[in-house]
Amino acid sequence: MKCISWTVNGLRACMGKGFADFFAAANADLFCLQETKLQAGQIDFAPPGYHAYWNYAEKKGYSGTAIFSKQEPLRVQYGMGKEEHDREGRLITLEFPAFYFATVYVPNSQRELTRLDYRMQWEDDFLAYLQTLDQNKPVIFCGDLNVAHREIDLKNPKTNHKNAGFTDEERGKMTALLGSGFTDTFRYFYPDATGIYSWWSYMFHAREKNAGWRIDYFITSDRLQPKLRDAKIHTDIFGSDHCPIELDIDL
């Protein structure tokens, strides 16, 4: 099973930069989007052969997620069932016979860390949600987790130590998640790889200099490790400040 995740930073803008071509060429079984920045009816994208699921933020032009699946799921859930977290279109979960599959756009802690306290609450509630799913079936989830976990996951760790996405608090929550029975699939295959990132600022020619961060992930329940085949980061694909990531798994 081939899974793709891409934080598109506005799907309408990305459509003008080759999105549909990449979608068709990828031919993924599951294709996930984060940061769609859409409201219902604002785009006409219904690829043949896929079931489409969209979650929109109440605030226009903000956040949003989508999943395109070749197989129709047993059930779809939008959000995690907590009103304070479910207004921004950040989470979609599909239930299949043998596993759960979710895409998520984790809240950014913002400059000056103005949303860090909220982010910490989100992290605790999201982990509890994942653990509840995991008690029933193994879980795969993907998306922009808005954290570089280790120093090798960004180009400039020292100068970013207290910036959103690389605070001790955010990294600690990621450590806790991975210590709760979940696997960072890219690091499973490439534990020491450096210089491979999924996001680059639009400023300072960051992508040209590869001054990036790895903040997009495919995470699975640990018990799916024997079924993992590869994890990829498509740094050659443009169209957003993020590039697509991929998981190949025998399911």
Predicted ranges, named:
Residues 1-9, 98-110, 142:
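Active-site-proximal beta-strand elements of phosphoester/diester hydrolases
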Residues 7, 23-41, 101, 130-151, ...:
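Active-site beta-strand/loop signature of hydrolases that rely on acidic residues for catalysis
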Residues 1-47, 51, 57-62, 177:
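N-terminal, active-site-proximal structural segment of metallo-dependent hydrolase catalytic domains
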Residues 70, 94-97, 221-222, 240, ...:
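Active-site beta-strand termini and strand-to-loop segments that position acidic
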Residues 81-82, 107-123, 158-163:
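Surface-exposed cleft-lining segments at the edges of enzyme active sites
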Residues 51, 125-211, 215:
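Metal-dependent phosphoesterases centered on the DNase I-like endonuclease/exonuclease/phosphatase
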Residues 37, 42-109:
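Structured beta-strand-rich core segments of catalytic domains in phosphoester-bond hydrolases
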